């Protein structure tokens, strides 16, 4: 056995030998280490060149030499390691050629026997390469191995030699303290002091830390105060604690002692140099997450910190920390977070402390939310068809299983199918009638799919499934057998309230038009009722009531039998009216278009007359020769009707035939077709039974009017309808009663357009044919819910013909009898345009001589501005329409905007307007397919070919005016600008627009219009300020001027007059400003403004009446006394109660019909309801009463009193008359009497100006004459503002002679008041009480007039 000393000497010998040999070796040669053992590592490069520095001096190179030493006795290992650690480096060597230094000697690998195996373990800072750390080779008892990482112990010698490798480089962030004073130059990297410190310290650091295995370098990074704290970085492999202490000692020894380095202040921090593992890699909400921190150091001082909240983590119900030491060389700490939430996301720090070392490792984790996608609601039919509920998760989650649960009143299980790879699960339901018992239809069951991950995360979604039973339909049980013209209904009841669609079909599969049936949904079922008000033969057949839910159909069937019976309107009688000689007879007949099995009789009164049947091709007539002699007396009118009875014993009466029995000598006109008549007699006959040529195959329609003139019948009016148009009219009447009218409509519109185009000449000379076409369009416009481009083209082609210039004269004749035909036509065209749906085809554009149309379809939420221009060169007219895109954004997608322009329609619509009101311009109508409640604004520009005279108005055609016959209305429209030839209108709604001239209204831009505006605004403004000042003055002097009952009531009236007029004027000026500035005021706000203006102006008048009655009472009933509270109650009831009652009644009587306000201004309506009378009549009555009171007062003042000289009396009387008029006129509202002059048309504009001036300045008059002219008010104001001396002198002077108060008992005027109504002289009162009473009464009169 060799001694340790000998072994150590041998090792030193080998080291020195190797060093000397290395000096003579070629750099490119491979050098194998010497060994005391025969083993040499094969294929391993034993000598590695580490560094070569090229300089001008001899090159210094560094080598790493691996030496293997084998011992027969393992006890030699520790002494050798101790010896090597005791060496001081570098060890200098000498050679004749070069100097060789040994910088460090480190033990890397130690192999020892362990049973039958050899375990080779790595020293600190070294480890086996990853590729050698196989699971079956590592030392399980001593090593904790994580796949993909270094291991520290192997069971056998590696094939390439037993050498552990240096581990990856780490950067040690270190600091040490120098116990010297800190200088500011150390903060400046360019200062000499900084460079000196840095150089000296780095030199010492390199000498000291050079002994560390894998040392690469050291850098001083800065200095901090606190003595001097040096921060620096050391780049090396992970060192052992023993080595780092040894290196620190060498640093202190190498550094100049003047730096006073404190050995105990060394600290080292490594960041993210530890192994940090997070499981799972992708974290989802609810997972159990493990964070493992591993470092090959022996320390159990490990802590965890949550950086987001600077929170030190401790063991709890959600967090658990486990720390352990493995292999006596590795510290492992594990943080487990249970049921992680998004609030736990952030950066986590694992901190391990060992001596001077702090090892920090940081990891930021994100918590992903779990999103389970599923249909929120589903409806499932209980028809045994499979329905799948699907749930899928978003994100790459490692799901382990999916569970389905259900909760509800009924239990309907399904079959789950889960595809973990696609993160989806399907639950298939197959519900049948047994699982959905009666009454359970509509029951809701909640199905929950819950996804569970391998790490504990759970995500779920609820699917609300409503189970629908197959509908059981119950249809009207009674047989339906009706006759033509009668109504019938079929009721179809479902015991299920859930359905997607309900419709009715004929047996041929034709859908019944939806206008014929209504469907209602109830809690426990549904009901659909097919109602036919006028049955025809087309309704004869079988009908199916169909409830559809998804692909399930429930059908109920009902047969309908319709027996032939002519409709009353289709029975043609002749004559409509006739004259019959009392001794003669007359042929009467009733005709129908289709034959049938009918029993027909004629009836007059209680008598029944037989009928003879006559068939003439398609026309079937029943005739009777009426004998006038059968009537008991002559000069009588007899009504005769036909009575049709069919096989079902249902009957119908024809229109009545009126026979006028007259003596034969009165008859002068005779005609075999028209009949007989007396002079001046006017009768109507159906055109087909008149002298107008007609054929049974193509009968004409309409009526013709004859008048007996002399001995001849003259044609007075011809309203006959040509045969082709009459045929179209009859077809239209039948179409709207047909069950398949929507399918027949396109073909009919095409035939109508072709026929009207061919019959243009006949229409231009036949008012009856023109009226028939209008009736046809009106009937058909109620049919469609959707109109395509082709149908709209046919409609406009028809309209183009009947609006042509050749037909305009026919319109005049037509509207002499039917005034609403033009409005009816316009309404029909608007209804067609509102139903226009272009679908996928381009928007329709139509242009003809008399009508043009443009349209646009809203396809997106950001449409373009709607701009259309229409030009009619033949009429020299044009117009533009603009709707800003901001208003179009409020419309539904696929909405259609349609604008049509008509150059001749205004002349037709305006025939009831005065000629000088007519402005020659287009009529443009704009409609939207879907109604909108959002604010709307349309701008239109018209060319006006009648620019002269009056104010231009923007108007629209209001179909509800004039008992729904229509009329021009300006509500919601105003003129934005106009230069005479062109007018731009702005409106807040859609319909048909045009412009009119208003000759009676001054042009707002004229001098007169501007003058009236200035007077109104300035006057009302002054009035408001004056009234406010009046109220302020009254408030200031109130206590001083209301010391007796009369003064109190006088000032109470004045205050309420001023307050009511102030509020009324404020409302007035606000509304006027809004309308003058063309702001759109909503109808509700306009109604409210009108109500308050009405109420407060009426209050002004009634308080004026109260003041007048108070004056009359105090002057007439001098000795009558009434308490203040009674007078006050009566005054307020009269002043506010009466106006409120009148205003509320007016509003309640007119607003339900929307005729409370005017069309273009917020004030009481006049044209439709005469609501203005609710203001005018009370106001005029009050003015008359106050005028009467004024006359009485002035008359009594003028009456002479005893003892006055005539000249003095005359002067005093004139003064009192002037003062009374000046006070009473503004106070009692006499100026409103001028309003009578403005009511009548054609009134001189001077009266308008006078009326405006007097009334708008009424507030100023009340302030001056009703308030400030009162002596008591003046005295109170003077006293209030401390002018006591002047007031005292004034009082003294006014107490003498002529300054005696004019209404004191001693004054002549007071005596005159006492002599009212024939009483003369004065009262001689002997008691103090009576004197006091007389004084109060006298002062009462004074306070009323002053």
Curated annotation (Swiss-Prot):
Residues 1329-1346 have a biased composition (Low complexity). As an adhesion G protein-coupled receptor (aGPCR) exhibits a large N-terminal extracellular domain containing highly conserved GPCR autoproteolysis-inducing (GAIN) domain. During synthesis, intracellular autoproteolytic processing of nascent chain within the GAIN domain generates a mature protein, consisting of an N-terminal fragment that is non-covalently linked to the C-terminal fragment. The mature protein is routed to the plasma membrane where the N- and C-terminal fragments remain associated, forming the holoreceptor. Residues 166-273 form the SEA domain. Residues 1327-1346 are annotated as: Disordered. Glycans are attached at residues 73, 94, 106, 188, 256, 272, 301, 315, 328, 398, 472, 487, 505, 540, 627, 649, 666, 820, 931, 963, 982. The keyword Zinc does not apply. Highly glycosylated. Proteolytically cleaved at multiple sites: one in the GPS region of the GAIN-B domain (S1 site) and the other in the SEA domain (S2 site). The proteolytic cleavage at S1 site generates an extracellular subunit and a seven-transmembrane subunit. The proteolytic cleavage at S2 site generates a fragment that undergoes proteolytic cleavage by the processing enzyme furin. GO terms for biological process: adenylate cyclase-activating G protein-coupled receptor signaling pathway; cell surface receptor signaling pathway; energy reserve metabolic process; erythrocyte development; fat cell differentiation; G protein-coupled receptor signaling pathway; glomerular filtration; glucose homeostasis. Pfam families: 7tm_2 (PF00002), ADGRF3_N (PF25387), GPS (PF01825), Ig_3 (PF13927), SEA (PF01390). One of its GO terms (cellular component) is plasma membrane. It comes from the Eukaryota. Residues 991-1006 are annotated as: Tethered agonist. It is found in: Cell membrane. GO terms for molecular function: G protein-coupled receptor activity. Coiled coil: none annotated. Expressed in lung endothelial cells and in alveolar type II (ATII) cells (at protein level). Expressed high levels in subcutaneous adipose tissue in lean individuals and at lower levels in visceral fat. Expression levels in subcutaneous adipose tissue drastically drop in obese individuals. Its main location: membrane. Keywords: Cell membrane, Disulfide bond, G-protein coupled receptor, Glycoprotein, Immunoglobulin domain, Membrane, Phosphoprotein, Receptor, Repeat, Signal, Transducer, Transmembrane, Transmembrane helix. Adhesion G protein-coupled receptor. In alveolar type II (ATII or AT2) cells, required for normal lung surfactant homeostasis. Modulation of both surfactant secretion and uptake by ATII cells is mediated by the downstream activation of GNAQ/GNA11 proteins and may be a consequence of increased cortical F-actin assembly induced by ADGRF5 activation. In the kidney, may play a role in the regulation of acid excretion into the primary urine, possibly by regulating the surface expression of V-ATPase proton pump. Belongs to the G-protein coupled receptor 2 family. Adhesion G-protein coupled receptor (ADGR) subfamily. Homodimer; disulfide-linked. Heterodimer of 2 chains generated by proteolytic processing; the large extracellular N-terminal fragment and the membrane-bound C-terminal fragment predominantly remain associated and non-covalently linked. Fragment generates by the processing enzyme furin remains attached to the extracellular N-terminal fragment. Interacts (via N-terminal extracellular domain) with SFTPD. This is Adhesion G protein-coupled receptor F5. The lineage of its organism: Eukaryota, Metazoa, Chordata, Craniata, Vertebrata. The gene is ADGRF5.
């Amino acid at each position: 056995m060799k001694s340790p000393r000998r072994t150590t000497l041998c090792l030193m010998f080998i080291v020195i030998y190797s060093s000397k040999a290395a000096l003579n070796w070629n750099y490119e040669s491979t050098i194998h280490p010497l060994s005391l053992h025969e083993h040499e590592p094969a294929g391993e490069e034993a000598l590695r060149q580490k560094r070569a520095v090229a300089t001008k001096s001899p090159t210094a190179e560094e080598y790493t030499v691996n030496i293997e030493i084998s011992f027969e006795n393992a006890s030699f290992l520790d002494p050798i390691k101790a010896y090597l650690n005791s060496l001081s480096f570098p060890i200098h060597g000498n050679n004749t050629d070069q100097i060789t230094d040994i910088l460090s000697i480190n033990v890397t690998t130690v192999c020892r026997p362990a049973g039958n195996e050899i375990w080779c373990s790595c020293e600190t800072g070294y480890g086996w390469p990853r590729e050698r750390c196989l699971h079956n080779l590592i030392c399980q008892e001593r090593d904790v191995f994580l796949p993909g990482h270094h291991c520290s112990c192997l069971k056998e010698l590696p094939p390439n030699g037993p050498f552990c490798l240096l581990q990856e480089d780490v950067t040690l962030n270190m600091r040490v303290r120098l116990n010297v004073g800190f200088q500011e130059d150390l903060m400046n990297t360019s200062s000499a002091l900084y460079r000196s410190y840095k150089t000296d310290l780095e030199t010492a650091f390199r000498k000291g830390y050079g002994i560390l295995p894998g040392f690469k370098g050291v850098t001083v990074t800065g200095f901090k105060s606190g003595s001097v704290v040096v921060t620096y970085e050391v780049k090396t492999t992970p060192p052992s604690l023993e080595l780092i202490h040894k290196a620190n000692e060498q640093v202190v020894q190498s550094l100049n002692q003047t730096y006073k380095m404190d050995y105990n202040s060394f600290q080292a921090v490594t960041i993210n140099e530890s192994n940090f593992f997070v499981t799972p890699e992708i974290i989802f909400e609810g997972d159990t997450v493990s964070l493992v921190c591993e470092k090959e150091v022996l320390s159990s001082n490990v802590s965890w910190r949550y950086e987001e909240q600077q929170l030190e983590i401790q063991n709890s119900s959600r967090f658990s920390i486990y720390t352990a030491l493995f292999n006596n060389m590795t510290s492992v700490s594990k943080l487990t977070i249970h049921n992680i939430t998004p609030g736990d996301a952030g950066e986590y720090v694992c901190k391990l402390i060992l001596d001077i070392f702090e090892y920090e490792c940081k990891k930021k984790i994100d918590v992903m939310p779990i999103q389970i996608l599923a249909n929120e609601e589903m409806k499932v039919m209980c028809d045994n068809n499979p329905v799948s509920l699907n749930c899928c998760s978003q994100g790459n989650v490692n799901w382990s299983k999916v569970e389905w649960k259900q909760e509800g009143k009924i239990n309907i299980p399904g079959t789950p199918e889960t595809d973990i790879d696609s993160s989806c699960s399907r639950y298939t339901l197959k519900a049948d009638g047994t699982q959905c018992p009666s009454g359970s239809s509509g029951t809701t069951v909640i199905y929950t799919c819950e996804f569970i991950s391998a790490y504990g995360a759970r995500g779920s979604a609820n699917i609300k499934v409503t189970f629908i039973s197959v509908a059981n339909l119950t249809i009207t049980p009674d047989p339906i057998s009706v006759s033509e013209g009668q109504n019938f209904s079929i009721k179809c009841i479902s015991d299920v309230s859930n359905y997607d669609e309900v419709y009715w079909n004929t047996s041929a599969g034709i859908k019944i038009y939806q206008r014929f049936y209504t469907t209602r949904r109830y809690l426990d079922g549904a009901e659909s009722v097919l109602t036919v008000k006028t049955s025809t033969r087309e309704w004869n057949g079988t009908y199916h009531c169909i409830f559809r839910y998804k692909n399930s159909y429930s059908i109920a069937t009902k047969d309908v039998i319709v027996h032939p019976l002519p409709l009353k309107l289709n029975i043609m009688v002749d004559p409509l009216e006739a004259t019959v000689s009392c001794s003669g007879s007359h042929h009467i007949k009733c005709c129908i278009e289709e034959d049938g099995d009918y029993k027909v009789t004629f009836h007059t009164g209680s008598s029944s007359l037989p009928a003879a049947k006559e068939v003439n091709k398609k026309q079937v007539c029943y005739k009777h020769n009426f004998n006038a002699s059968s009537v008991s007396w002559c000069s009588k009118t007899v009504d005769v009707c036909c009575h049709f009875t069919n096989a079902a014993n249902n009957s119908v009466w024809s229109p009545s035939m009126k026979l006028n029995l007259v003596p034969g000598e009165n008859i002068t006109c005779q005609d075999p077709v028209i009949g007989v008549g007396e002079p001046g007699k006017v009768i109507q006959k159906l055109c087909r039974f008149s002298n107008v040529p007609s054929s049974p195959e193509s009968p004409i329609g309409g009526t013709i009017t004859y008048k007996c003139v002399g001995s001849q019948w003259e044609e007075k009016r011809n309203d006959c309808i040509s045969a082709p148009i009459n045929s179209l009219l009859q077809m239209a009447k039948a179409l709207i009663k047909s069950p398949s009218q929507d399918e027949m409509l396109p073909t009919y519109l095409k035939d109508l357009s072709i026929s009207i185009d061919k019959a243009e000449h006949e229409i231009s000379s036949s008012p009856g044919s023109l009226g028939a076409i209008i009736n046809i369009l009106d009937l058909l416009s109620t049919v469609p819910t959707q109109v395509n481009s082709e149908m709209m083209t046919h409609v406009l082609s028809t309209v183009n013909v009947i609006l042509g210039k050749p037909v305009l004269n026919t319109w005049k004749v037509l509207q002499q009898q039917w005034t609403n035909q033009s409005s009816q036509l316009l309404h029909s065209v608007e209804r067609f345009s509102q139903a226009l749906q272009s679908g996928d085809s381009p928007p329709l554009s139509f242009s003809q001589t008399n009508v043009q149309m443009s349209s646009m379809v809203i396809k997106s939420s950001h449409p373009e501005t709607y701009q259309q221009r229409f030009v009619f060169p033949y009429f020299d007219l044009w117009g533009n329409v603009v709707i800003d895109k901001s208003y179009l954004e409020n419309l539904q997608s696929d909405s259609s905007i349609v604008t049509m322009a008509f150059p001749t329609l205004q002349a037709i619509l305006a025939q009831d307007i005065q000629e000088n009101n007519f402005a020659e311009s287009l009529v443009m109508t704009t409609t939207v397919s879907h109604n909108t409640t959002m604010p709307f604004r349309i701008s239109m520009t018209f060319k006006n070919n009648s620019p002269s005279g009056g104010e231009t108005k923007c108007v629209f055609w209001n179909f509800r005016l004039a008992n729904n016959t229509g009329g021009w209305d300006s509500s919601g429209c105003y003129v934005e600008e106009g230069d005479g030839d062109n007018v731009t209108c702005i409106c807040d709604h859609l319909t048909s627009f045009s412009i009119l001239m208003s000759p009676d209204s001054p042009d707002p831009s004229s001098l007169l219009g501007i003058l009236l505006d200035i007077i109104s605004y300035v006057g009302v403004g002054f009035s408001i300020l004056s009234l406010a000042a009046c109220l302020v003055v009254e408030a200031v002097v109130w206590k001083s001027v209301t010391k007796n009952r009369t003064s109190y009531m006088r000032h109470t009236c004045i205050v309420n007059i001023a307050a009511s007029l102030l509020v009324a004027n404020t409302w007035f000026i606000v509304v006027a400003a809004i309308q003058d500035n063309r702001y759109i005021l909503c109808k509700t706000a306009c109604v409210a403004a009108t109500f308050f203006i009405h109420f407060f102006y009426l209050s002004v008048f009634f308080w004026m009446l109260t003041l007048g009655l108070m004056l009359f009472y105090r002057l007439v009933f001098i000795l009558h006394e009434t308490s203040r509270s009674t007078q006050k109650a009566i005054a307020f009831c009269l002043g506010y109660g009466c106006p409120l009652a009148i205003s509320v009644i007016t509003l309640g009587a007119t607003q339900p019909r929307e005729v409370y306000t005017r069309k273009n201004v917020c004030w009481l309506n006049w044209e439709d309801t005469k609501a203005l009378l609710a203001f005018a009549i009370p106001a005029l009555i009050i003015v008359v009463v106050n005028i009467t009171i004024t006359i009485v007062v002035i008359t009594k003042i003028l009456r002479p009193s005893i003892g006055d000289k005539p000249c003095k009396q005359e002067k005093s009387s004139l003064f009192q008359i002037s003062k009374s008029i000046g006070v009473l006129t503004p106070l009692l509202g006499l100026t409103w009497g001028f309003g009578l002059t403005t009511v009548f048309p054609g009134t001189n504009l001077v009266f308008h100006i006078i009326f405006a001036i007097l009334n708008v300045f009424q507030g100023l008059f009340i302030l001056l004459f009703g308030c400030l002219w009162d002596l008591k008010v003046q005295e109170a104001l003077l006293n209030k503002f401390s002018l006591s001396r002047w007031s005292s002198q004034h009082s003294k002077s006014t107490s003498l002679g002529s300054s005696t108060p004019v209404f004191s008992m001693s004054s002549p005027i007071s005596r005159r008041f006492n002599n009212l109504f024939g009483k003369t002289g004065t009262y001689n009162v002997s008691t103090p009480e009576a004197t006091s009473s007389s004084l109060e009464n006298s002062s009462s009169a004074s306070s009323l007039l002053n």
